Structure formats: C-alpha cells, structure tokens
Amino acid sequence: MDFSPVGEESLGVRSMCFYVETRDVRILFDAGVSLAPRRFGLPPHPRELERARAVRAEILRLAEAADVVTVSHYHRDHFTPWYPSVYMATDGEMYKRVYRGKKVLMKSPQDLNWSQRRRHYGLSKALQETGAEAVYADGGEWTFGETRVAASPPLWHGPAGSKTGRVVGFAVSDGEERLVFLPDVEGPLEPEPIAFAREARPTVVVVGGPPTYLGWDLEKAIKNLAELVELRPHTLVLAHHLLRDMQWREKVAPLFELAERRGVEVATYASLAGRPEELLEARRRELYAKEPAAAVETGEGEEED
C-alpha cells in the first residue's frame, strides 16, 4: 500500500484529503479543500488562497487516477462542490473532473444537520450528471481484488449530540498494511471511532484531532488518542482541527511521550510529505502583519466548515 497526503492544515488549508493506492484500487479520501472565511476577524491571506489553488490542482491530478472517491460528510472541506467558490478553489465545473465515472462512497443524509442535508442534495444531483456510481457508505464493505474497504457506522462529528451531526470513517486493508481514516471525529471524543479502529487492527491511523480553540474536553481527547496509540499502529497521523492551533504539540505533549514509549511514530500530513508544517490559518494575523495585503472579500458566508 502506498499513501500520500494531499491537503490539510499542516499543509496550509482546511482539508483531510488523502490518497491511498493498493495493487487493486486507488482511493481519494474526501476530495475537498476550503479556507476559513474569517479567523481572528480576518479573511484568508493571499498566501492561503494560493495554497488552496495548489491543493485543488493536486486533487484534480489524483482524481484522474482514482477509482474511488469518498465523502465522509458534507462540510465544505470534504467534497468538491458543483458551484464556484474562491475559498474552495473551484470554478463550479471541477467537480466533474473529480467524480465523473468514479465509485463515490458517501455519507447518507441521515444524522445530518440542515445545511449538510442541503449540500448532500445538491451534490447527489451533480453526481447523477457525471455518471458517478454513488453509494451510501455507512457501515458498508467492498472488495477490490485482494483489497478490502470498510466504512464505519455513523460517528459523531465531535461530542455526542453535536449539532454538526455524524461522519463515516474508513478502513483499507491490502493484506500488508491496514489503514484507518477517521475524519472530523475531533479527538476522538467518543468511543465509537476507537472501536472501529480496534476491529481493523490498523498499522496506520489518520485521525482528525481535537479543536483546542472550541473548548472541547481536551483531556478526554488525549485519553482517547492514547487508546489509538495502544493499538500499536506504526504511524499515527494527527490532523485537521488540532492543527489550527500553533501550540498544538504542547497541548498534546503526553500523547507524544506515550507514543515514544510504545514505538509509535506521531506524524502530520506535512511530515509524511517531507515538508515543514505551514499552519497558515493559525498564522493569519501574523501573515497580514508581515506581508500586508488587501483583503479579498468574496461574500462567501460564515458556515461551519
């Protein structure tokens, strides 16, 4: 199994896009990218806009090769929309290049809030136009040659009862590596993502970490991340909300200590790519101070990502 990070906060954008290739199938997880319309009272800096365009170009390149594309849920950084967006770096036509002719494993509209159900409806109509094979993934399993792909039951996007609803995670096994992809579980804060990972016996875990800036129970999140370490994957990739905080390493320091004792490498998308971390959103105030630029106001609203 080969895998490579595509876009994520350590690479300068909001995303968890990740590419996995086995002997049998090529999967593009959550082919989306977006930028926070406002952070610290500021719109995205031009460097963020440039990075979003670069990530979008890489998504389009990898989508050409992919057999399967996932949509774990309908926040804007996890799918390619059918409408133009500066902050999602798309012209309203790029979704065709991402989804045309693909098998699309997508979250069912159950357990979603109104805005996500609305996006699900729009994306479903767009997928019909592309000839994609759209399948509700929740709890499903698929076999491609010797590669098995399993989707989790619906998992909470953050704490149980969260208004943002639920997501689906995925596990890919090719007989050698076993990779678990847990987007936007925000910790995890609940036990279900851990149970799904435990059943998969992962060698690699990619997990959306806790948003320290939202005041969630960080101690609980670290405890649950420790349970993922105890599964003894060779690599634990921390991603997404956690890396919107410049002090994220200090805030989860006990996890690094445990992982070192257990022989588990704690990685980021940037480190997997052999690149330095560039937390552009977390540095937005600094970027405007060091590289003054006219704010690009697009009129794109403040919705949850």
Swiss-Prot record:
Transmembrane segments: none annotated. It comes from the Archaea. Belongs to the UPF0282 family. This is UPF0282 protein Pisl_0021. It comes from Pyrobaculum islandicum (strain DSM 4184 / JCM 9189 / GEO3).
